[in-house]
């Protein structure tokens, strides 16, 4: 009996060695993942996707690039990982008779799953209409109906919302029964549009593949994170050219994902290698482990008036190279500042300072996976202040003096005699802020007397209910924490700015893994200079803490804003911040197990270890009261 064509393709000598596959790869019980990229700036994330896929057990990856995609991907970055890369020229040039392989057929036979990320509007249209004018579209047309296809569209907002696109989505879903779309996300695009269209976060794309194939990650000893060929996450040199862009006119850009990886490791952390070489490749040079540096929480030297009291000279941005991290999640924040500066309306405000403001900008999304803590790096955020304030909220405390005694002065202005009197709270002692955040979290509906009264078992303990529901009924759609109580607002020194948080549990990313906990916070009034960096860190910490107490893994923090503004006296300081290139976010670890902590009330500052926080210096900004 003659050998099957795909086996001959794997073993016989053909003119182009790039399409050779060893026979063991067809019978090796490995997961064969074919990753394709089309013409979109989002293709700069391809190397990150491939690297991450290679951190799973028993995975082999091959790559197909359309001709436009080759403008954004360095082939050498992929081949250095032991990955074969194919393009249109490889489809028929080796065919000189009936026994010769046809590349798009052989790749289809080899693959267990096809991932197209990004999927441009052009390729989507071809797929919906059955065109096969290049290697990828021919492969799609020849795809076995029962094999899964994962599709991550990316395009301009108006292209995504065009009715033709919706027809194409429906047609593809109808024709390819085992196809799934990884929907794009909302963001500020480079062309100036605001809305849906950017490719989904690359880590979420990898997670969908892992979930589909039920992949398990490789395990390594701590401190074994190494880079292939000395390269870090953003290995494409093209990345520098697009560091501040979000899309292009035809095929999308993607910058809502964090491209940095762990640069420090905890001695007790079980982490995953960034990539491993395939057995069939030659030995590759491995970079040395990054040195570990830890910033103790108690070592913050900045006494805060909203956390920023030290002025430093601007540090010039350094161009990205292929061996540097690119923190695209912090770039969301910086790009929103740019958008407000360019498009914001001048508005008066309660404090008399004046602002530039926009309403309901695209949400910001921050990955919390792998112990990530989104603590901004383009200025030093007063981490101890964030933690102490959060614990103060959790305890239901409303006395600003308790923070001041610890050197945290962010509430001093609102608790002053002058400010309380201006609010008509003349009977309150200095520092008594009334039934603000923590009181609503722990005693919602209780009658407020003063900050010294014992409110034990009074009102609704929303935070305790959140944790209980997450444990007992994690898929409940009413897991809500609200600080907005209209009846109590007249008694508050300052009505809450961040008013509403919802929690959401999703399935583990891999078999045997922990459920994933995400949170979404709505902020009615968002001070981009001082408040928002604090709020991002605070709610990310809260999500990590609740996940820790529930035995879950923190997954994502989503930040939704209403009146999003920049105070006029912050303009110069923020221009300095915009000149800085974001660095990698730090990692958060807990020093005690949940059972040793006991309850959410028992956390202390000493329970937190934040590693790898290496920000630029602080930037002085005045707090408007």
UniProtKB/Swiss-Prot annotation:
Keyword list, A-Z: Cytoplasm, Methyltransferase, Nucleotide biosynthesis, Transferase
Signal peptide (residue range): none
Pathway terms, separated by semicolons: Pyrimidine metabolism; dTTP biosynthesis
SUPFAM superfamilies from the UniProt entry: Homo-oligomeric flavin-containing Cys decarboxylases, HFCD, Thymidylate synthase/dCMP hydroxymethylase
Regions of compositional bias (Acidic residues) in chain numbering: 243-257
Annotated active site: 497
GO biological process: coenzyme A biosynthetic process; dTMP biosynthetic process; dTTP biosynthetic process; methylation
Residues binding (6R)-5,10-methylene-5,6,7,8-tetrahydrofolate: 527
Record-given protein name: Probable thymidylate synthase
């Amino acid at each position: 009996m003659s050998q099957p064509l795909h086996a001959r393709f794997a073993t016989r000598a053909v003119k182009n060695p790039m399409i050779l596959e060893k026979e063991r790869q067809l019978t090796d019980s490995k997961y064969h993942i074919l990753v394709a990229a089309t013409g979109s700036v989002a293709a700069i994330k391809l190397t990150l996707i491939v690297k991450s896929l290679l951190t799973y057990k028993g995975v082999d990856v091959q790559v197909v690039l359309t001709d436009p995609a080759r403008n954004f991907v360095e082939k050498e970055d992929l081949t250095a990982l032991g990955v074969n890369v194919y393009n249109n020229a490889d489809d028929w040039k080796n065919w000189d008779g009936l026994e010769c392989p046809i590349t798009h057929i052989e790749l289809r036979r080899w693959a267990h799953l096809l991932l197209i990320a990004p999927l441009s509007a052009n390729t989507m249209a071809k797929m919906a209409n059955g065109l096969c004018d290049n290697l990828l579209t021919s492969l799609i047309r020849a795809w076995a109906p029962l094999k899964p296809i994962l599709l991550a569209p990316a395009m301009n907002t108006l292209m995504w919302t065009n009715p033709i696109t919706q027809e194409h989505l429906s047609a593809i879903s109808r024709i390819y029964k085992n196809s799934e779309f990884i929907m794009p996300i909302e963001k500020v695009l480079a062309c100036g549009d605001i809305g849906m269209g950017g490719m989904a976060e690359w880590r979420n794309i990898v997670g969908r593949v892992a979930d589909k194939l039920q992949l398990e990650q490789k395990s390594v000893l701590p401190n074994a994170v190494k880079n292939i060929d000395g390269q870090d996450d953003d290995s494409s040199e093209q990345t520098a050219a697009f560091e501040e862009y979000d899309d292009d006119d035809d095929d999308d850009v993607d910058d809502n994902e964090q491209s940095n990886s762990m640069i420090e490791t905890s001695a007790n952390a079980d982490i995953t290698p960034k990539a491993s070489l395939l057995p069939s490749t030659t030995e590759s040079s491995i970079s040395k482990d990054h040195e570990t540096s830890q910033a103790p929480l108690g070592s913050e030297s900045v006494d805060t008036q909203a956390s920023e009291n030290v002025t430093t000279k601007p540090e010039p941005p350094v161009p990205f190279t292929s061996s540097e991290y690119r923190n695209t999640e912090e770039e969301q924040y910086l790009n929103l500042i740019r958008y407000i500066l360019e498009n914001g309306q001048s508005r008066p405000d309660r404090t008399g300072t004046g602002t530039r403001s926009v309403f309901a900008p695209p949400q910001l999304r921050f990955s919390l996976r792998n112990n990530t803590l989104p603590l901004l790096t383009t200025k030093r955020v007063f981490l101890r202040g964030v933690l102490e304030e959060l614990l103060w909220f959790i305890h239901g405390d409303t006395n600003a003096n308790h923070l001041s005694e610890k050197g945290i002065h962010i509430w001093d202005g609102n608790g002053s005699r002058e400010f309380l009197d201006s609010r008509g709270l003349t009977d309150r002692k200095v520092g008594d802020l009334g039934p603000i955040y923590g009181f609503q979290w722990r005693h919602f509906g209780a009658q407020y007397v003063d900050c010294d009264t014992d409110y034990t078992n009074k009102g609704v303990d929303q935070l305790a209910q959140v944790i209980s529901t997450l444990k007992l009924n994690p898929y409940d759609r009413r897991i809500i924490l609200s600080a907005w109580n209209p009846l109590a607002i007249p008694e508050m020194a300052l009505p809450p700015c961040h008013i509403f948080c919802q929690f959401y549990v999703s399935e583990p990313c891999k078999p045997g893994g922990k459920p994933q906990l995400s949170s979404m916070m709505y902020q009615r009034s968002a001070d981009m200079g001082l408040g928002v960096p604090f709020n991002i860190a605070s709610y990310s910490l809260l999500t990590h803490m609740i996940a820790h107490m529930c035995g879950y893994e923190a997954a994502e923090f989503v930040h939704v804003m209403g009146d999003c503004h920049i105070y006029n006296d912050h303009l110069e300081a923020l221009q300095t911040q915009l000149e800085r290139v974001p660095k990698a976010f730090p990692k958060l670890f807990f020093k005690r197990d949940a059972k040793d902590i006991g309850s959410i009330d028992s956390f202390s500052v000493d329970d937190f270890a934040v590693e790898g926080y290496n920000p630029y210096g602080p930037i002085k900004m005045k707090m408007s009261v």
